[in-house]
Amino acid sequence: MAKGKELKGRIRSTENTRKITRTMEMVATSKLKRATDRVAAARPYALALGEVLSHVYSPELADRFPLLRRPAAPRTVALVILTANRGLCGAFNANLIKEARSRIAELEAKGLTVELHVVGRKGVGFFRYVNRAIASQRTDITDKPSAADAASLIDGLMQRFAAGSIDAVYITYAKYLSALSAPPATEQVLPVAPPTAKAEGGVQHDFILAPSADAILEALLPLYVRNAVYRALVETEAGFQSAQRTAMKNATDNATELLQVLKRTYNSARQAQITQEIAEIVGGASALQG
């Protein structure tokens, strides 16, 4: 009955694992709802900022604002890479790192020096493992990213860009499209590229600019950049929760299938053992009668 005991042990272990993965799936589902609510709340604000900026901006103003500066001969760029602090999310982190490495290779092929600013333990751990220099790292951003997190992440880079010590800032993140799709993407954050469309859906709005276009643009540009980073943070978090929910659901389903196989195998082994014991008893009784 050694095989039967071994199977019972595997059944208990698999049942315990299924309880854990099912619980993690439920937690991820709950967190995903909150994360998608933050994504939905961030998008209208981003559209409104973009609409106002498109009305205020004009090419003749560009030379007066450092965040609009486009260096003629860029030398150094910063790449902000968003990853998760945790795993158990399928290929989510691996895909983000793959996207980042692809962009790094692309930028370096143009002769640019690329500074890495990595968010998340998984990204930090990977680039340390491959001995890639990291200019800054953050592992303290929680699963509820805030506007303050975005400001603390980008404000220093904005100051350096305005001072001319870096010539562009890019961000690699998970672009949340739906619960089933959050592909990795890289976007340029600095210099700011003002939206060209005057308004969404072809609707035009007239603005009265006060005190002046310059004053509005000076206040608006940092908000626009911070909001772009905040949106990347909340979309990446939503993508992570979606990936973890999917991974844990798959693990739960696999555990259920394995349990069915193990129980069938155990029942077959138990049945064979009982049949053998009956045969031995019958054989022994027949021998005594004989």
Swiss-Prot record:
Name of this protein: ATP synthase gamma chain
Xref: PANTHER family: ATP SYNTHASE GAMMA CHAIN (PTHR11693), ATP SYNTHASE SUBUNIT GAMMA, MITOCHONDRIAL (PTHR11693:SF22)
Biological process annotations from GO: proton motive force-driven plasma membrane ATP synthesis
InterPro entries, per the entry: ATP_synth_F1_ATPase_gsu, ATP_synth_F1_gsu, ATP_synth_F1_gsu_CS
Keywords tagged on the record: ATP synthesis, Cell inner membrane, Cell membrane, CF(1), Hydrogen ion transport, Ion transport, Membrane, Transport
Cellular component, GO annotation: plasma membrane; proton-transporting ATP synthase complex
Subunit organization: F-type ATPases have 2 components, CF(1) - the catalytic core - and CF(0) - the membrane proton channel. CF(1) has five subunits: alpha(3), beta(3), gamma(1), delta(1), epsilon(1). CF(0) has three main subunits: a, b and c.
Role summary: Produces ATP from ADP in the presence of a proton gradient across the membrane. The gamma chain is believed to be important in regulating ATPase activity and the flow of protons through the CF(0) complex.
Family the UniProt entry places it in: Belongs to the ATPase gamma chain family.
GO MF annotation terms: ATP binding; proton-transporting ATP synthase activity, rotational mechanism
Gene3D superfamilies assigned: 3.40.1380.10, ATP synthase, gamma subunit, helix hairpin domain
Subcellular localization(s) per the UniProt record: Cell inner membrane
A Pfam family reported for this protein in Swiss-Prot or TrEMBL: ATP-synt
Source species: Gemmatimonas aurantiaca (strain DSM 14586 / JCM 11422 / NBRC 100505 / T-27)
Membrane-related topology note: Peripheral membrane protein
Xref: PROSITE patterns: ATPASE_GAMMA
Classification lineage: Bacteria, Pseudomonadati, Gemmatimonadota, Gemmatimonadia, Gemmatimonadales
Residue ranges that the Swiss-Prot or TrEMBL entry lists as coiled coil: none
